[in-house]
A protein has these predicted regions:
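Conserved NTP-donor binding/palm subdomain of two-metal-ion nucleotidyltransferases/polymerases, i.e.
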Residues: 1-112
Length: 112
């Protein structure tokens, strides 16, 4: 599981700048934490900071998310970021997705 994912992440992002590798890693980790019901608002805030303030190639992030089979998750997380911490659309690398998967993410967030 996780070792394969780490190798795939390394292969897919081998030629990408560090910023893109970091954001992609954050997304992979967020998905894992959510599956274990261990994602906190702090994790969400860190993802928000990265997406909003780090200078990265947004279209490349979308391509990476497709290669990593993370695109729907990325889009759902953008919706969560918009709803929970008010990420504006101008900072979103992709279209947010509001569906049952996004609501599941919200229900699994540890809001303390």
């Amino acid at each position: 599981g996780n070792k394969l994912l780490a190798h795939k992440l390394k292969d897919v992002t081998a030629d990408d700048p560090e910023e893109l590798r970091e954001i992609t890693t954050m997304l992979v980790n967020a998905r894992t934490l959510l599956r274990k019901r261990q994602m906190s608002m702090r994790h969400l805030a860190e993802l928000y900071d990265a997406i909003k303030y780090v200078d990265y190639d947004e279209s490349r992030l979308v391509d990476i998310s497709k290669d990593m089979k993370l695109r729907k998750f990325l889009r759902r997380m953008l919706q969560v970021l918009a709803d929970e911490v008010y990420l504006e659309e101008g900072f979103m690398p992709d279209n947010p997705l509001n569906d049952s998967g996004e609501r599941t993410i919200k229900s699994r967030l540890l809001i303390s």
